[in-house]
Every structure is written in C-alpha cells, then in structure tokens.
C-alpha cells in the first residue's frame, strides 16, 4: 500500500493539516508519546507527523576543546548537542519509524528559510531522502491547505534551503570562533569569563562603541543667543534673534546693546 508521509513544523500544525486533508476524521496515534495522524485523502493513505522546530543543529565533527578557528562542522541531532533538547529524540525516532513504511514524502513546514531547513534536515537525516514534495501555504485554513496540497511542487525550495543553511553555518562560524577568541583573550589577561559574540551582536556592539567614542570625544563649543520677552494685549510672547546662535560673544553683546535701545 502506497503511503505518503507529510511532515509539519510543529504538532499543532500537523493536526490542522490532517483535519484539512482527511476524507473523514483522521485517526490520532502516538509513538513514544509523540502524536501523528493516519488518514485517507481522495482514497490515498497518508500519515501526518511533525518536527518540533529544529530537530538538528550544527556542531563540530570532532570536539577539540576551546580551539579556534573551527570550520569542520556537521548537522547532528539536537539532543546530542544540548541536554535541554532531550525531548527532540522522540520526534526524530517517530519520523524514522514512519518513514520506513512511506514511499512518498511531502514537506509542509512554514514556507520560509527556517521552515525549509527544518524540512530538509527531517528529510535527509530522519527519512534518508534527498528531496521531497513541498506544500506552500501562508495560513492553516482548510481551503489554503487543500490548495497547497493540490498544487504542491515536486521538489523542496532549494533556494530557501541553501540560503537558510548558509545562514546557520555563518552564525556558527562567526559566533563560536569569535566567542572562543574573546574568552581566550580574557583568560590571557589573568582572568576568566565566558564571552559571547554573534553575527548580529558583534556589528551592533561596534556601532554602540563608535557612538560612545563620539560622545566621549565631543567638545562643546559655547554660543550665545538673544531673546526678547514682550508684552501685548493678549499676553506675553517670546521672540529670538533671527541669527539664532552667535559663536562670538563680542558680536552677540554688540547686537544686544543695539537692540536694547530700540
């Protein structure tokens, strides 16, 4: 029996996709407490499962301590990178199990660079597939999901996937290597503190430092202004000399003495 596996970005999206495409009510099942849905769409058997955001992250191929620069990295299951991502293992295991009985694969993650990377990694590392169909939708309403399925492309959006993967790698190269360099420099100064910097954080810090340097280097230049407080029937009014700022005190005093007599 031909089975199509659809992979959503998160559990709530998987449920809405299953509800939208099912000929009748989908059957909710679970593996390792991870929910997935079995259904038929126009008589064809489908299974809708989900990721839970990024299932895989970038890490060094071989750990070498706090050395830098490091450029040999690869995608690894998130739970092998961080203990806080232990829950991700059950989602990966569920996709591995479901993919073993599927012959068609469709990615239905959010249609953006992050969604494309999530879908690509689920395909190649959990399902062992090089490519898959791609649903593209902007809302999770039933009409949009049905239309997205009927008009799905036969390949993922490789432009978005490559852009997203490149950004992740640049973030890693920039963040990890420079953070290690900063920490090492602090340690060399007979101190120790873990320092961090990132692709966005670094340039932003540079802008702050430059602005602070400008403020520190600023030397105020004195100037003089001439104002007039007048009285009319409706009350008082305040007027300023048309020159606004006088950069020479003598000039300001001369004009002040002149207008004072008028």
Q: Regions from the language model: what does each represent?
A:
Residues 1-176, 240-260:
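Intrinsically disordered, low-complexity regulatory segments
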């Amino acid at each position: 029996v031909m089975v199509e596996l659809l992979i959503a970005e998160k559990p709530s999206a998987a449920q809405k996709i299953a509800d939208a495409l099912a000929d009748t009510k989908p059957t909710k099942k679970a593996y390792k407490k991870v929910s997935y849905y079995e259904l038929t769409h126009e008589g064809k058997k489908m299974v809708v499962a989900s990721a839970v955001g990024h299932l895989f992250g970038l890490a060094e191929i071989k750990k070498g301590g706090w050395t830098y620069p490091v450029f040999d990295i690869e995608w690894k299951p998130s739970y092998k990178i961080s203990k806080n991502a232990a829950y991700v293992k059950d989602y990966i295991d569920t996709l591995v199990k479901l993919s073993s009985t599927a012959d068609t694969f469709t990615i239905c993650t959010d249609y953006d660079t992050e969604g494309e990377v999530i879908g690509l990694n689920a395909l190649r590392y959990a399902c062992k597939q090089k490519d898959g169909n791609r649903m593209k939708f902007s809302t999770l309403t039933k009409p949009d999901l049905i239309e997205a399925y009927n008009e799905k492309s036969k390949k993922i959006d490789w432009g978005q996937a490559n852009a997203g993967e490149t950004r992740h790698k640049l973030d890693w190269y920039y963040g990890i290597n420079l953070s290690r360099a900063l920490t090492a420099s602090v340690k060399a100064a007979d101190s120790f503190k873990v320092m961090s910097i990132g692709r966005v954080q670094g340039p932003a810090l540079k802008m702050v430092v430059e602005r602070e340097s400008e403020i520190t280097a600023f030397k105020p230049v004195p100037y003089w202004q001439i104002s007039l407080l007048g009285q009319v029937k409706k009350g008082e009014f305040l007027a300023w000399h048309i020159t606004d700022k006088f950069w020479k005190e003598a000039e300001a005093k001369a004009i002040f003495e002149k207008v004072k007599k008028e």
